[in-house]
Amino acid sequence: MRDFLPRPAIAPATVWTFPTPRRARLSNGIELMIFELPGQHVISAHLVLDVPLNAEGRDIEGVATICARTLDEGTLRHDGDEFAELLETEGAGFGIDLSLSGLQAVLDVPASHLDRALELFAEAVTEPSLAQRDVNRHVQLRLAEIEQAQANSSQIASIAFRAAVFEESRRAARMNGGEPATVSQVTPEAVGAFHHDHFGPAGTTLILAGDFADDPVAVAERSLGSWRNDDQRRVVAEEPAAGMRRMVLLDRPGAVQADVRLGGFGIDRLDPRWSAISVASYAMGGAFLSRLNAILREEKGYTYGVRMNFGPLRTGGSFAVQGSFRTEVVADALAITRELIEVEQAPFTSQEVDDAVAFFTGVSPLRYATAEGVADQAATQVLAGLPDDYVDRSLALLRSVTPEAATEAYRSVVHPDGLTLVVVGDAERLADPLRATGFPDLEVRTPALEDTQP
C-alpha cells in the first residue's frame, strides 16, 4: 500500500508593491517618470499629452483621432515608407491611445535600440507631416469604422447608452472618434491646426519603463528636450454630467437576440467609495459566478454571459449591467436583473468580499509583470490625476473593505428604480413585454447613428 506525503500547507501570498518611479524634468519642462525594471529588456515609452477631447471644435469632433492616427504616416524628415522602415530596423513598435482625458503615444523597443528609436518617436509626435492624402485616408477609414459599428448590435447599444447616460452637451456623451457629420468635416488644415495648437511640452509627461542600457534621462533629453511650442494652448478637461433617465429600444427587425445596457452615472477613482464599489461590482457582475451570471447564465441559460462594470473617467464615470439575451427572454431577464441588483435585502457577504479582494490583489502582480503593463498604468494615473503610489494605496484600501462598506457604497451609487435602459433588438417582439416589465416610458427608435443622441 502506497504512503502519500501530507499535502503541504499553502502560505498566503506575500504583499506585492507597484514599482516606484524616479522623477526628473527635461529642459523644456516635460515631466519624466522612470521605472527601473531589471530583466525587462523591452523598453516601454508612453508620452502622455494633456489634450482632453473637449479641446476639439464641436463641428470637427474626431480631429484628435485623425491627428493621432496620422502621426506615424511620415514626418518632415522621412516619408511614410521610410519612417516605417526605420522603426522596423530598430525593432520598434509605435502606437497611440486616445481617451476623453488625453492622448498617449506609445513606443516599445529593445533596450539596446532605445536611443535611435526614441528619436524617431519624437519625430512622429513633434513634426509629423500630416500629409493631405494620409489625413483624407484616415477620415475615410474612420467613416468606414463608424459604418461597421452601426452593423454591430453590441456597439450600437454601447454608443446609445453613452449618449443617454451623460448630459447631451458634454463631450463624454459622444464617441471619442467623432461621428459621421463631424468626421466628414475634418480637413488636413484642421488636423494641422489641432496639432499646432495642442501638441507641446507643457503638461506633457514621458514615462519610460524597463532595464536601461544607458541613462534614460540623457536619452530622453536628446530626443525631446529641444521640443518647443510657444503657441501651445492648454484646455481644462470638461467635467461630465449625468443625463436624464431614459428608456430606449432601438429597433432591429428580426433580431433573434437583444443587447442590453442598464446603468447610470458613476464615480471616479478619486472618490473615497471607489475601492468598496470595485469589490461590490465584482461580486454583483464581475466574477464568473457573480450574482448576475450565476442566475442569468448558469441557472436560467438566458445568456452566454452578463457582467456589471464601472467605467471611471477623470471626473465621474458610468456603470452598466450588460449582456446579450435571446429575444423571447429579454423582459424576464431584465425583471430578474432588477431584483438581483437591489441589495437592500441581500447585502454582500464576507465570502463575496474575500473573493473580490483575493482577485484584485492576486491579479495585480501579473497585470504589472511587464514594462508595458507598468508604463500603461502610470500613464492612466497621469491622465486621471492620481498619485504615484495609487496602486499600492488602492490595494491597501481594498484589503480593508468590509461587507458593510461594499453594500453601502453600492447602494449610494446604484439606484435600481432610476437606471437608464438601452435595448437593441426586435421592437415588435420586445416593446410590449418591456413596458409591462416596468419600463412604461420606453422610446422605440431606429438605430441610425444620428438617433443615438438624446
Predicted segment positions?
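C-terminal regions of mature proteins
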Residues: 1-14, 19-21, 205-210, 352, ...
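Acidic/histidine-enriched segments that form metal/cofactor-coordinating
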Residues: 2-3, 9, 84-194, 240, ...
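An aromatic/glycine/proline-enriched structural segment found at the starts
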Residues: 2-16, 172, 176, 200-201, ...
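Buried hydrophobic packing residues in well-ordered domains
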Residues: 29, 47, 65-66, 87, ...
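M16/MPP (pitrilysin/insulinase) zinc-metallopeptidase core fold and M16-derived inactive scaffolds
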Residues: 44-108, 174, 287-302
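M16/insulysin-pitrilysin zinc metalloprotease superfamily fold
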Residues: 73-77, 107-141, 287, 311-368, ...
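Short acidic/His-enriched helical or mixed secondary-structure segments at domain edges of catalytic enzymes
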Residues: 143-159, 244-245, 249-251, 255-257, ...
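A structural supersecondary motif
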Residues: 261-265, 284-325, 445
